[in-house]
Amino acid sequence: MVSDRSGQRRPGKSRVPGALRSRVYLHIGEPKTGTTFLQQVMWSNHAQLAAQGIVLPGYSHRDHSRASRDLREAPRVAGDPAASWAGEWDVLTGQALRAPWAAVISDEVLAACNPPQADRGIRSLLPAEIHVVLTVRDTASLLRAEWQETVKCRATVPWEEWLAGVMGTASAADRRRRSWFWTVHDTLATLRMWSRHIPPDHVHVITVPRQGPAEALWARFAAVLGIESSRIDVPSARVNCSLGLAEAEFLRRMNEALPDGMPDWFYTRNIKQILAHQVLSTRSAQPRLALPTAQQEWASEQSEILFAGLRDAKYHLVGDLHDLLPPPASGRYVSPASVPTQQLLDAAVHAAAALADHQFRASHPVRAEPQRPRGLRQRASKLEWAVLNGLWTRRLLHNTSHLAPVRRLRVVIWCLLTHPARHRPNPAVAGDLVDGGGENRTPSPGRGRIRART
């Protein structure tokens, strides 16, 4: 059963005839806390969510990821074939504000925003009723998951050395924001930053269940949205699975051998998404990474600090705070550096065979009968994908996506194609678009003016 400290049901449908404000749920992370699983559940059930009053702006999670990069001012790598993400945050928030019901924006790396970026994120969603959602887990399992994620992102730092670096910056506030781990996992600081302009009961902290099926995490997330989790189909496929001890060490050593000239975007698409996620993580019954004995006490202390901080705060807690306390360690610690050579060789052979199969399938694709898109939403998704990825449009998009008229046009197209019956043109919306929208716009009839809390 989901534990809700407020004891209140939070309805999903927020915009009804006569309502003053829309509602937007901003799911900001943290990474490695089941966020990918929750996003997969929502995007594979967007029609069922809409039936319960929850809308996902954009056409896929990629739109949320690109918007997050725009908000965080993430630099583009030279040669990256992906389209520019300049202006994507304004497009996504514009769609969320014009959604017919409550909207959800979800990207785990939003936790990496600095204070000015978080302030901009909140201001851009006014005058909506804004809710910030954060999922959290115990420190010990988080450390294991994050090191593996760094390895899947081309890192070469051994486990014990990486762990020492995280521990060395834990108490230095000026260095904390320079460490990626603490940038996205300094939970109490992240909550303070995002909650400065919204009521504390609009900040929802969800603990990741320590045991049990993945559906339990979805049930907690659905409780925050105010919808019935049982009416949503939860995918059976495992998402973002962890690597075995030998697989993680093999990938780390392979990263050391890769040429410096290989671009990061190529690594992400082929090594991380194919080799790590689809191949190495599927090798079952492999020994798993554990914390060294000397570091287990430190991880427990960090979990207790988080436990006490959330217990004393006024945020809306969903789940059990005891999920944040790691269970006692069991078994003998095995360092990744001491994995037997035969286990590394087995992982390497498995990886080489899978990459060869992937290359063959990529060069000899099976041609299937073209399927006609069904529904306006699917057609819109295919159309925008073609536009964003067409070679002849990339330069044009790079030069114009930041322009306000282009952003507003994309918002209008999304509204008309995804919810045509609820977005018929009217003078209020048309005037809003001409005036440029934003936080200083004149409210439409029936909509109150909302000011940011200072």
Regions found by a protein language model. Give the residues of each.
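Anion-recognition interface
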Residues: V2-T454
